[in-house]
Amino acid sequence: MLMSKEDESQMTFSMLPDDLVLNCLARVSKVYYPSLSFVSKKFRSLIASTELQELRSFLGCTSSGLYVCLRFRTNTDYRQICFTLRQKISSSAKILVPISSLDSPFDYRSGVVAVGSDIYAIGGRNLNNSASSKVMVMDCRSHTWREAPSMRVARDDFPSTCVLNGKIYVIGGCKNLDSTNWIEVFDTKTQTWEFLQIPNEEVCRGFNYKIVGYKEAIHVSSLENNRATFMTYEIHKGRWREPHLSLSHGFHFSNCVIENVFYRYSYEMLQWYDSCRKIWKNLKGFVRRSIMNPRGEGVKMVNYGGNIVLLWEECVTIKKKLIWCEEVVIEKKHQGEIWGLLKWSDVVFITDEKNQLVRALAPDV
């Protein structure tokens, strides 16, 4: 039976079967997903579905997206805005653009971490300036927010976070830490919180905590009376131990973990940790960037789909500030050598507003 011209004019893309629409969406760049999510409720639902993510994975269409949080100073307080890295139209240059979402519903003091295609904003402060246990999640496929189960303890003072095997580990953010609130663990699959056992009460007395997930263990550093303390928790053995001293040196610098290798930016050099010889080695082929802070202070480092992305600020004048970004391709050679080859480096953001580069994340998109 032939379709009449009137029927043809009434036929729309949204009337197609879900399987066919998913097949089309899976082949479209995720750069367009936030805009497509406004087409209809059906599109928004399909874009946020696990089926689409699974289909993209099956087709080999997944990639990492770079999200950058900047903190801007206002007359009375701070506001945090999220940007994503996009390529300019008809150009190979890349720029940071604000995400097409409502203002971030989380406080700039929140702990923020990426798991899969989600960005979790953990804790911070409520509107009445009290500590918050709230957890908000942004789906990077549609740039929509939802609420996750709250923590058991309110944390408002920049809690440190890391991800290991689909679980989010949160430490600090409280003024009075003890064995009941030192570390909380969130299982993203079961959506449940639990506390992690601690070795002793003494480790809770520090402040300025940092936590890193590396080689089936979480590594914690803290400061107390200008003295750093380091502890390692082995997940499968369920026990705490002191890490090797050379490994603990990686906590003082910008760092990230890629395929079970610990990398850091230290004194204008990218280095990786040789866990067999217990030493730090320079990444061969990487050219020093003298424009950065020599110690790496303020440099943000992130695992970007198996490569390293570095971001840093350059103050040109009192008002004008640039944000640089560069991507370094990681190549593992025989005999255990690791090379870092510069893929691109450019200014991705220019502003005359007072702001600070807070963090960088690379969720799956």
Curated annotation (Swiss-Prot):
Kelch repeats mapped onto the chain: 118-165, 167-213
InterPro entries in UniProt: F-box-like_dom_sf, F-box/kelch-repeat_ARATH, F-box_dom, Kelch-typ_b-propeller, Kelch_1
Keyword terms: Kelch repeat, Repeat
SUPFAM superfamilies noted in UniProt: F-box domain (SSF81383), Kelch motif (SSF117281)
CDD domains the UniProt entry points to: F-box_AtAFR-like
Domain F-box stretches: 10-58
Pfam families per the UniProt record, alphabetical: F-box (PF00646), Kelch_FKB95 (PF25210)
Database matches in SMART domains: FBOX, Kelch
PANTHER family in UniProt: F-BOX/KELCH-REPEAT PROTEIN SKIP4, GALACTOSE OXIDASE_KELCH REPEAT SUPERFAMILY PROTEIN
Name of the protein in question: Putative F-box/kelch-repeat protein At4g39290
Organism: Arabidopsis thaliana
